[in-house]
UniProtKB/Swiss-Prot annotation:
This protein's record includes keyword Membrane: no
Quaternary structure and partners: Part of the 50S ribosomal subunit. Binds 23S rRNA.
InterPro entries membership: Ribosomal_eL20 (IPR028877), Ribosomal_eL20_dom (IPR023573)
Disulfide bonds: none
A GO CC term assigned to this protein in UniProt: ribonucleoprotein complex
Protein name as annotated: Large ribosomal subunit protein eL20
Gene3D superfamilies, per database record: 3.10.20.10
Organism: Methanopyrus kandleri (strain AV19 / DSM 6324 / JCM 9639 / NBRC 100938)
Keywords: Ribonucleoprotein, Ribosomal protein, RNA-binding, rRNA-binding
Length: 80
């Protein structure tokens, strides 16, 4: 079984006629590809945007101690 890492994904997405909306997501995943799929799925579900409307600018692995979401920190076992 692969080790779970934390990836930070940054980019923008289009919602209708509005200007592009920036986003940053921190997601647990075993690979960059898995993290990317999670972001596509989450943004599509939450905002009703297609993959073609999402532009990824950066994806990078981050240290679990840098995670901002308290729920994700707890799941990763990072001390407060």
């Amino acid at each position: 079984m692969s080790e779970v890492k934390v990836f930070e994904v940054r980019g923008t997405f289009r919602m209708g006629d509005e200007p592009r909306q920036p986003f940053t997501r921190q997601v647990p995943a075993t690979s960059e590809e898995e993290a990317l799929e999670k972001v596509y799925s989450d943004l599509g579900s939450e905002h009703g945007v297609s993959r073609m409307e999402i532009q990824i600018e950066e994806i990078r692995e981050i240290d679990p101690s840098k995670v901002e979401d308290p729920i994700l920190r707890r799941l990763l076992g990072v001390e407060e």
